[in-house]
Amino acid sequence: MSQCLINDELIKEEFPACSRGTWFATGIVGIMPKSAAKVLADAVLRFETEVFYNYQELDSAVETLRRRLASLISAENVTDICFTRNATEGIIIGVSNIEFESGDEIVTSNQEHGALLDRLTYIERRGRAKLRMFEISKEPEETLESVKKQVSRRTKLLAFSHVSCQTGIRLPAKEICEVGRKVGAYILIDGAQTVGNIPVNVRDYECDFYAANGHKWLCGPKGTSFLYVNPDSAITLSPTFLAFGSSSDDLATRRNAMRFEYGTREKILLFGLLAVIDLYAKWDWELKDGRIKELSAYLRERLNEIPKCIVHTPMDWDKSSGNTSFSVEGYSLEKVSGYLSNEWRIMTRSVPEINAIRISTSYFNTNKEIDRLIEALKAL
């Protein structure tokens, strides 16, 4: 393992829950570091009880966070970022601001989360566009070829997950976006499983929307997420919702992502996400990310030791992520999941689409926890 400040002592101090069980479900929701949670709790107490609390301090923290997140995903402008409650909300904002006409088509993948798929299916059922699907493969070249077969001049929207929530496969986002741009399609990327897990560079992708979470791999407070909106798209799209906050001081609609922020919001939660981001800067982002990479590789190597385990995630890090999915021959996912949680206190995520278990190896997990998982599977 990398010589990182994130060691056993730090994990014990910052993540006390890890002493009571193993949390391999960061892809569902992350565990917030204790010191960052305390910063949030103190801020909530002060904000909600002190009449003379300085709102400028809170607003300043929110804008600092906006700058940090823009930098984290390599956005060109700070104003390309708007805050949402979750990636699902970001997806809805993106899709809802596209006007579909008869004959339009939407292209997505065969491994999408309901956050995106349910919305796209609804559009198709209303007769507004036809839904087409490309197949995700372990090999990016094969995935790309499938995309090319589905995309055409009729494609109004190309929407896909950067990392599959089912298999943990990392899609070739840049190349897929190039295919979409050639036919003039809007491009939306579901980044629910990426930010805090793998590097993200939206300028490289040139997508119109990139929806991300703050509460999964970033391990921030629940209800903190954000949406990247390409500045060119923000100008041309007609917002579905406009209200107080969507306009600048002269009442003109904002010409950037911030037009999608309106009404009273729980800004105080963003104070907590900023505390987490600051903590990662202190620990070193690269070492944190390197730890996820090394733990994921170690997990897959150990799983391959068990003949009855079928790993659905590529070994190559450039083709995968911190999510690893596997099936156990002869056992249903309900049997395996229940066995791990009830008898070993190992929490995972079920993937019913492929009868698999998904393991999310975050930076606070350890080799010992992986060894214990392997021990449990061998005893099954």
Map each language-model feature to its residues.
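Pyridoxal 5′-phosphate
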Residues: M1-L380
